[in-house]
């Protein structure tokens, strides 16, 4: 080989080695340039690396109340500014990576109404699923409808906000497992077992707050949980009574979520989760998503609540259950009682700053903002696939206390000659 060629090769090799060394050093230097005490930049780094997924937002119900689910007439400026807590610019400012939209419909106004009182709740729930999905479709440049955790991760990689649906109360499906199944097929991926009323499956926390006994889960409850486990639908224990929490955790085969609840030991409100349940949630591999409602997080002095109150709840749950079992579920647009510093969805980066300032590592913060709930959702799906592969069929059990002729009256269709008419002319 000619001397000049050897010289050029040597120079090229030396340059390559130098560049290789430089590339191995620069990222380390770039990371090191963010001081540990620069919590804003560290929070930004967390939110770039993990999707911030909120467990509960009531914007679809706010749309129903304000526009009767009309979103195409120009009266819902979601892309610019809405009066409530949530719109697209504020979601972007809040660095949100995913949102469980609640397709909420209220319990009957009479707290003493029979559980099987005929209502329009199931119809209205389908309308809320419809408007939520139409909203996501309308703003598909920024939002992506997802019904599985893989899609949620893909949305984050594409710079979109994953949008998922949750039903807030078993009354919304008429205490019917078949109706629940259809809601799942329509895209709902969690159901809160009760809202502020008992149903055929469990006792609500609001019932106990009203001075009535905590009867926990009903005899029909295990059938519901069995079907939700089979489907791969997240079991949400926010709003249920403390005994209902304990009973359901005994029968579920999959991790549970609390979509918007905080720590009972910090604030003695029955909507919060007691320590013994937090420990069981850890064994169950579930997640408690901390809510921001002032009267929940400081029952004694709600006016004093600020972002540090929420940090206190987060750290208590992390201490009792572990950092693998805590998340965020603000309840934006479902309450007017929000902490100072967390007035709308744009404030999430500030919360993460405060969590880091209080001593959490960035790894712990990533778990908090979204990795935990995605892990739970993934495990719920894996368990469902295993159950389905075992040959488990859809649950057909019907609540014995239900009204309605077709299922509550026995006919001779199977046992003897069919009648000439079934009364369905």
Swiss-Prot record:
The record, for InterPro entries, names: Metal_Hydrolase, Pept_M19
GO MF terms listed in the record are: metal ion binding; metallodipeptidase activity
Q: What cofactor is this protein dependent on?
A: Zn(2+)
PROSITE patterns according to UniProt: RENAL_DIPEPTIDASE_2
Give UniProt keywords alphabetically.
Dipeptidase, Disulfide bond, Glycoprotein, Hydrolase, Metal-binding, Metalloprotease, Protease, Signal, Zinc
Q: List the disulfide bonds.
A: 107-197
In terms of Pfam families, this protein maps to: Peptidase_M19
Which N-terminal stretch is annotated as signal sequence? 1-31
Q: Which residues are glycosylated?
A: 403
Q: A Gene Ontology biological process annotation?
A: proteolysis
Q: Where does substrate bind?
A: 195, 271, 331
Q: What's its catalytic activity?
A: an L-aminoacyl-L-amino acid + H2O = 2 an L-alpha-amino acid
Q: What is this protein called?
A: Putative dipeptidase MGYG_00085
Keyword Zinc in record: yes
UniProt keyword Membrane present: no
In this chain, Zn(2+) 2 is annotated as bound at 168, 239, 260
Task: Give the family from UniProt.
Answer: Belongs to the metallo-dependent hydrolases superfamily. Peptidase M19 family.
EC?
Answer: 3.4.13.19
Q: Where does Zn(2+) 1 bind?
A: 56, 58, 168
Q: Where are the transmembrane segments?
A: none
Chain's role = Hydrolyzes a wide range of dipeptides.
């Amino acid at each position: 080989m000619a001397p000049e060629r050897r010289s050029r090769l040597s120079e090229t090799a030396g340059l390559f080695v130098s560049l290789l060394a430089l590339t191995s050093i620069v990222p380390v230097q770039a990371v090191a340039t963010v001081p540990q005490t620069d919590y804003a930049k560290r929070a930004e780094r967390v939110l770039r690396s993990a999707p911030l997924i909120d467990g509960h937002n009531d914007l679809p119900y706010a749309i129903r109340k304000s526009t009767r689910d009309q979103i195409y007439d120009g009266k819902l400026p979601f892309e610019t500014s809405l009066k409530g807590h949530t719109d697209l610019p504020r979601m972007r400012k809040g660095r949100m990576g995913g949102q469980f939209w609640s397709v909420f419909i209220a319990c009957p106004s009479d707290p003493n109404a029979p559980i099987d009182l005929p209502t329009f709740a199931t119809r209205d729930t389908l309308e809320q699923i419809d408007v939520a999905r139409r909203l996501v479709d309308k703003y598909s440049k920024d939002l992506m409808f997802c019904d599985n955790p893989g899609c949620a991760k893909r949305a984050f990689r594409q710079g979109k906000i994953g949008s998922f649906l949750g039903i807030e109360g078993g009354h919304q499906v008429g205490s019917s497992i078949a109706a629940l199944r259809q809601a799942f097929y329509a895209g709902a991926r969690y159901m809160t077992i009760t809202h502020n009323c008992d149903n055929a499956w469990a006792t609500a926390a609001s019932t106990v707050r009203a001075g009535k006994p905590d009867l926990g889960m009903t005899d029909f409850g295990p059938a519901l949980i069995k079907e939700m486990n089979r489907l791969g639908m997240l079991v949400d224990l926010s709003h249920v009574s403390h005994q209902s929490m304990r009973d359901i955790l005994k029968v579920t085969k999959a991790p549970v979520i609390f979509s918007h609840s905080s720590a009972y030991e910090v604030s003695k409100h029955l909507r919060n989760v007691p320590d013994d349940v937090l420990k069981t949630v850890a064994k169950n591999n579930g997640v408690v998503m901390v809510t921001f409602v002032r009267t929940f997080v400081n029952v004694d002095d709600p006016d004093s609540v600020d972002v540090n109150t929420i940090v206190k709840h987060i750290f208590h749950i992390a201490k009792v259950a572990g950092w693998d079992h805590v998340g965020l579920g603000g309840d934006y647009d479902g309450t007017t009682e929000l902490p100072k510093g967390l007035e709308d969805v744009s404030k999430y980066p500030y919360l993460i700053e405060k969590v880091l300032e209080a001593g959490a590592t960035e790894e712990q913060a990533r778990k908090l903002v979204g990795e935990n709930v995605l892990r739970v959702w993934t495990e719920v799906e894996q368990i469902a696939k295993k159950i389905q592969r075992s040959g488990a069929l859809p649950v057909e059990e019907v609540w014995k206390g239900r009204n309605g002729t077709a299922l509550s009256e026995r006919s001779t269709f199977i046992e003897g000659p069919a009648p000439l008419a079934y009364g369905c002319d």
